[in-house]
Amino acid sequence: MRSGVIAQKVGMTRVFTETGEHIPVTVLKLGNCQVLGHRTSEKNGYTALQLGSGSRKTVYMPKAERGQFAAAKVEPKRKVAEFRVSEDSMIPIGAEIQADHFVVGQFVDVTGTSVGKGFAGGIKRWNFGGLRATHGVSVSHRSIGSTGGRQDPGKTFKNKKMPGHMGVDRITTLNLRVVQLDVERGLILVEGAVPGSKGGWIAVRDAVKKALPADAPKPGKFRLADGGEQAAPAAEQEGV
């Protein structure tokens, strides 16, 4: 199981195929996504990579956080996240993961925070049908109707779908296809919509319900902190 990456949503556009078909895509940008630390089964009970992306000023940063970035010898990061990996997919601390960590045509799962909608009614929030247009109904056409029973149970149960705050939820969209890659600018173009607003942080992982392409680099495609060579695809590593 390979590591994912932390990307930032740029926006949506479209690309054209050789046959003239247009594909709506979301542009995701890798902003200096580096490995900050390792989580091992011996020390932590599980195996994972801690990644950081973006830039952050140290003025209001706690001393403990500054020490973590200093120990990894990387610049302070705006966004930090962990990705579970297998033991053979560990990437050196300080390495920068590049856009060609993924390959064109593979499927990925993206996770982000949905756009906030504020206080919403039952029709917008839960797709309720509302009340009738006529037959004695006035003013309450967009009401949700009854919320409980009668004297028994005599209450509204917890988790009842009602009006309330909508959005700002953690959303994962499965099986988005990678359409194009721009390694120089660190861009990943995936087909379809990605949850979140422009500038929002997105976690991109290999799709769990799709097979990993044979030409996907293992443990990943990255650039070492000392300027060393990048990791080669699995086929090249095995001498195929």
UniProtKB/Swiss-Prot annotation:
Keywords: Methylation, Ribonucleoprotein, Ribosomal protein, RNA-binding, rRNA-binding. One of its GO terms (cellular component) is cytosolic large ribosomal subunit. Methylated by PrmB. The modification N5-methylglutamine is found at residue 151. This is Large ribosomal subunit protein uL3. PANTHER family: 50S RIBOSOMAL PROTEIN L3 (PTHR11229), LARGE RIBOSOMAL SUBUNIT PROTEIN UL3C (PTHR11229:SF16). The keyword Ribonucleoprotein applies. Residues 139-164, 215-240 are annotated as: Disordered. Residues 225-240 have a biased composition (Low complexity). One of its GO terms (biological process) is translation. The keyword Disulfide bond does not apply. The gene is rplC. Belongs to the universal ribosomal protein uL3 family. One of its GO terms (molecular function) is rRNA binding. One of the primary rRNA binding proteins, it binds directly near the 3'-end of the 23S rRNA, where it nucleates assembly of the 50S subunit. Part of the 50S ribosomal subunit. Forms a cluster with proteins L14 and L19.
